[in-house]
UniProtKB/Swiss-Prot annotation:
<dbReference type="InterPro" id="IPR046335">
    <property type="entry name" value="LacI/GalR-like_sensor"/>
</dbReference>
<keyword id="KW-0804">Transcription</keyword>
<protein>
    <recommendedName>
        <fullName>Catabolite control protein A</fullName>
    </recommendedName>
</protein>
<dbReference type="InterPro" id="IPR028082">
    <property type="entry name" value="Peripla_BP_I"/>
</dbReference>
<keyword id="KW-0678">Repressor</keyword>
<dbReference type="Pfam" id="PF13377">
    <property type="entry name" value="Peripla_BP_3"/>
</dbReference>
<dbReference type="InterPro" id="IPR006377">
    <property type="entry name" value="CcpA"/>
</dbReference>
<comment type="function">
    <text>Global transcriptional regulator of carbon catabolite repression (CCR) and carbon catabolite activation (CCA), which ensures optimal energy usage under diverse conditions.</text>
</comment>
<dbReference type="Pfam" id="PF00356">
    <property type="entry name" value="LacI"/>
</dbReference>
<dbReference type="InterPro" id="IPR010982">
    <property type="entry name" value="Lambda_DNA-bd_dom_sf"/>
</dbReference>
<dbReference type="GO" id="GO:0000976">
    <property type="term" value="F:transcription cis-regulatory region binding"/>
</dbReference>
<feature type="DNA-binding region" description="H-T-H motif">
    <location>
        <begin position="5"/>
        <end position="24"/>
    </location>
</feature>
<keyword id="KW-0010">Activator</keyword>
<feature type="domain" description="HTH lacI-type">
    <location>
        <begin position="1"/>
        <end position="57"/>
    </location>
</feature>
<keyword id="KW-0238">DNA-binding</keyword>
<dbReference type="InterPro" id="IPR000843">
    <property type="entry name" value="HTH_LacI"/>
</dbReference>
<dbReference type="GO" id="GO:0003700">
    <property type="term" value="F:DNA-binding transcription factor activity"/>
</dbReference>
Length: 329
């Protein structure tokens, strides 16, 4: 039989209001009364109803998490960092997969609000104008991790993609590359815009230009990388910058199948540095994003908003580095 708050109150010989105050951490309870109620709660194995507690305290200690593709290892590493910090601060996560579908994202966002979550966090992906509007009108705090929504008013955690692209491009030029391709995702996000800007900046410094026919997009998957290489093959560049590890590996394998030598004929750098980069041969050169930290810092930033703590900087930029492995010279 389910133990109720009434059972605890009767056993402890206090009012249900007193039990509720103890359960919700209200300090206006005498220590001896609190101890007695907690002893009864433990003995009866009473489990407070989370929804009822939320109605009483106006908090549910739950956060909504929206992930574009839960099967993608990039997002799973972000989620791991987020979940560890959520647990540390005693929050529970409701994780929803949006399939990179803006309409589904809106539906999930509104559904999470109806569940009275205390906050929402987006992990990577695209922040559409409609979602941005929902975020700005949201009754609960929202943070985006792994993207920044092209809006300084939205709290975010990310790396400096422009700087990373500049560093990668400069390195490749020093290794002899003169023609470049940029492979992005099918949706425009600020990270991709920043990579494009960084690439063009360095190319212009060396009197080089990006051929528009070599700026391609796909869905960030391995198969997309294979299809992308088919488009590149007739006008093969010296180097490719790839937003996604999976895309980059698809290009690598297709190049090898076509007899293209990597890195002698084609150099490749990706921007995710998931565990996949060390599972291929040659190992993939990649911009190292601190994925766990991006998720963790995003969750910590959200807890600050939810608990009305002071926010020094709502747009956090974490350090990156580039690991040059076997796909670059």
């Amino acid at each position: 039989m389910t133990v109720t708050i009434y059972d605890v109150a009767r056993e402890a010989r206090v009012s249900m209001a007193t039990v509720s105050r103890v359960v919700n951490g209200n300090q206006n309870v005498k220590p001896e009364t609190r101890n007695k109620v907690n002893e009864v709660i433990k003995r009866l194995n009473y489990r407070p109803n989370a929804v009822a507690r939320g109605l009483a305290s106006k908090r549910t200690t739950t956060v909504g998490v929206i992930i574009p593709d839960i099967s993608n290892v990039y997002y799973s590493q972000l989620a791991r960092g987020l979940e560890d910090i959520a647990t540390m601060y005693k929050y529970h996560s409701i994780i929803s997969n949006s399939d990179n579908d803006p309409e589904k994202e809106k539906e999930i966002f509104n559904n999470l609000l109806s569940k009275q979550v205390d906050g929402i966090i987006f992990l990577g992906g695209t922040i559409s104008e409609e979602i941005k509007s929902l975020i700005n009108q949201s009754s609960v705090p929202v943070v985006v991790s792994g993207t920044d929504g092209k809006d300084d008013h939205i709290a975010s955690v990310n790396i400096d993609f422009k700087q990373a692209a500049e560093e990668a491009t400069q390195y490749l030029i020093e290794k002899g590359a003169k023609t470049f391709s940029l492979i992005g995702g099918e949706y425009s996000i600020k990270a991709q815009d920043d990579v494009l800007e960084g690439l063009k900046n360095v190319l212009s410094q060396h009197q080089l230009k990006l051929d528009d026919t070599l700026h391609l997009t796909g869905n960030e998957s391995y198969k997309s990388g294979i299809k992308t290489f088919e488009q590149l093959q007739s006008n093969l560049p010296d180097a490719v910058l790839c937003i996604s590890d999976e895309q980059a590996i698809g290009i690598l394998h297709s190049a090898q199948d076509a007899g293209v030598k990597v890195p002698e004929d084609l150099q490749i750098i990706s921007f995710n540095n998931t565990r996949l980069v060390e599972m291929v041969r040659p190992q993939l050169s990649s911009v190292i994003q601190p994925l766990y930290d991006i998720g963790a810092v995003g969750m910590r930033l959200l807890t600050k908003y939810m608990n009305d703590e002071e926010i020094e900087n709502p747009n956090v930029i974490l350090p990156h580095r580039i690991e040059y492995r076997g796909t670059t010279q």
